[in-house]
Amino acid sequence: KPGRAFERVDYRFDVLTDYGAFRDLQRHRMLTVEWQRLTPNHGYVRPELIDEAGMADVFDDAMARSAALYDALKDEFPEQASYAVPMAYRIRYSMQFNAREAIHMLELRSSPQGHPSYRRVALEMHRLIAEQAGHRAVADAMTHLTVAAPELERLEAERRAEQRRGS
């Protein structure tokens, strides 16, 4: 467990992720999050599984219809229009937290059970703390960080869960 001295160092990240990843990341209590209103303006992330299932056209059509609904609502109902925007659309936000919270959050959000979209964010934050901020000691204190490729770890976790259900 990191000591109180880690509370003296602060980080601020500007992030652009799908809304689902944002919802998971913003849940942490010891951070400040400011976000733009959810709109279709930043585009969306189409999961690879959609492509593998041959459903890219259907998915893209659904995203286009939701964007059209948003556009129809935004002038008269600006506060409610974001309800027409699916979680696959990206949202821009900033996150500010201290090093102690970074250790907790990045170790938790890099775990194999996590969704690949927020795992990628956690790993990139870890890299930026070490390399751009030059805080290698803080990055090295994250001893439970999982650095394996997010997609492969999630697949392996799903396989283990399936084996448990089948046995």
Where do the protein language model's features map onto the residues?
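A conserved ligand/cofactor-binding region detector
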Residues: 1-167
